[in-house]
Design a protein with these regions (language model features):
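Mg2+-dependent phosphoryl-transfer enzymes with acidic/Ser/Thr/Gly-rich catalytic loops
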Residues: 1-5, 22, 188-269
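Asp-based phosphoryl-transfer active-site loop
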Residues: 2-18
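Active-site phosphate-binding/coordination module
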Residues: 23-123
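Hydrophobic packing residues within well-ordered alpha-helices of enzyme cores
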Residues: 25, 50-54, 165, 169, ...
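Residue-level signal for inorganic ion chemistry
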Residues: 32, 43, 70, 153, ...
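Short active-site oxyanion
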Residues: 36-40, 64, 152, 212, ...
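Short, structured coil segments at secondary-structure junctions
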Residues: 62, 70, 172-175, 229-230, ...
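Conserved acidic, metal-coordinating active-site core of Asp-based
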Residues: 99-217
Length: 269
């Protein structure tokens, strides 16, 4: 099978522990793009947090794509055209806010290059801002500040307590929206039906490819749907067990250029 689209998760997959793309991985990914294979970067990060990696991989030159907010937005990185967008229902924001507040957790969302929150000094808010190379904007009242359309909210906090809140919120919201953790300390709150596989189906239709022509590589629970959906689903060696169990192939870890290894094996060889 000649694969024409390579879909990559970022954290724990494309990037190493330092959140960097290694020179070998970059060189390999430029090589496959020169051969005509398109790359899509699919992440829970906001668009602003994915952009620097898209620039490093020259996605503009090679006509690649970004799936931000776990697939809530799809952007053609050459033209910067927004191909697809699914927004959070503002009616649900008061409930999300109350859940965070009663547990003394921070809740955040995004506005351009800013992470918006009432708790700018929270250690997990700082993690999210650092991860995405975004500035933190302190707001006095989250609900008053968020009047613009948003693709997701994030509640952040100590993992054990956050796991309990996740169960409670999932039961309350499962018919209305997606509730899941992308990291033990990050609880993602997104529009219902938003996952990487669903958004990739939209992208494939737009660009005239089939899922059999797609490789997807990831490590986390939010990568599971796209790994199951892709013609070739690949888990990183450092992936969660459930992801490995559902993958067609397990590559090396993100500390061992696992993405480059898979691209060399299935695209360049």
């Amino acid at each position: 099978m000649k694969y024409k689209l390579l879909v990559l998760d970022l954290d724990g997959t494309l990037t190493n522990k330092q959140k960097k793309i290694t020179p070998h991985t970059k060189e390999t990914l430029l090589k496959i793009q020169e051969q005509g294979v398109k790359i899509a970067l699919a992440s829970g990060r906001p668009t602003y947090g994915i952009a620097p990696l898209a620039e490093q991989l020259e996605l503009q030159k090679y006509e690649g794509y970004i799936l931000a907010y776990n697939g809530g937005e799809i952007i053609d990185w050459k033209t910067k055209e927004l191909m697809y967008k699914n927004l959070l229902d503002h009616d649900v924001l008061p409930y999300l806010y109350e859940c965070a507040k009663k547990n003394d957790f921070a809740i955040v969302t995004y506005d351009g290059e800013y992470v918006l929150t009432e708790k700018p000094d929270d250690e997990y808010v700082l993690k999210e801002a650092l991860l995405n190379v975004m500035k933190i904007k302190k707001v006095d009242n989250f609900l008053d500040a968020v009047k613009h359309p948003i693709a997701k909210c994030l509640i952040v906090g100590e993992p054990t307590r956050l796991a309990e809140l996740e169960k409670e919120m999932y039961e309350h919201l499962k018919d209305r929206m997606g509730v899941f953790r992308s990291e033990p300390y990050f609880l993602e709150l997104v529009p219902k039906g938003i996952d990487k596989a669903q958004s990739l189906a939209v992208l494939l239709k737009e660009i005239g490819l089939t899922r059999e022509e797609m490789i997807a590589i990831g490590d986390g629970f939010n990568d599971l749907s796209m790994i199951q959906y892709a013609g070739l689903g690949i888990a990183m060696a450092n992936a969660q067990e459930v992801v490995k169990e559902n993958a067609d192939f397990i590559t090396l870890s993100n500390e061992e250029d696992g993405v480059a290894y898979a691209a060399e094996k299935f695209i360049l060889s």
